[in-house]
Amino acid sequence: MSLDAPSIRKARREDASLLAAAERAIASVPGELASRPNEIDDDAVRKMILDLNDRGRGNYLVAEHAGAVVGHAFLESLSLAATSHVVRLMIAVHEGNQRRGVGRALMNELLRWARSNPSVEKVELQVRSSNERAIALYRSLGFVEEGRKTRRLKIGPNEYLDDVYMALWVGP
């Protein structure tokens, strides 16, 4: 079910506490994020927004609908000269807003930015093997699986999830 298209804007430093709280809520579900809720810090999110948007190391966006932030995502430039053509993508659709077009809207805007940035040639992401909806979204946008790390996340006694590595070439 799709809601009216969310509006997409640049993340601001004052968004950090809200974005960190949303990530903690997502992380409370085993396997959704690699981080545990107590490992997600408001100051780290604030620093990421500063590094990406204010210092030009990438692009950090939020999606809003009816005045509420419903998702966030970013592209982060890799730091080594040999990988400077690659950006890492992270996306989080906030609790209760899945299957409403939020993820696709954020992805479309990030990919538009990546394609218009001459220094970006490749977009990489990782996703849990259990997140079939996200994998389907990424494939529909042209991402291909490049590899898999088996049993990378331990979510319970003798219970593991694979990480799937996907990428999209946007360069020449």
Annotated model-derived regions:
Residues 13, 32-96, 107-108, 113, ...:
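Acetyl-CoA-dependent GNAT
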Residues 122-127, 139, 144-159:
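Conserved catalytic-core motifs of GNAT/GCN5-like acyltransferases
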Residues 7-21:
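A short beta-loop-alpha structural element at the N-terminal edge
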Residues 26-29, 115:
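Catalytic cores of nucleotide-enabled group-transfer and carboxylate-activating enzymes in metabolic
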Residues 2, 158-172:
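Terminal substrate-recognition subdomain of acyl/acetyltransferases
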Residues 107, 114-126:
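Conserved GNAT acetyl-CoA-binding A-motif
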Residues 19-27, 45, 49:
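Hydrophobic alpha-helical core bundles mediating ligand binding, dimerization, or RNAP-core interactions
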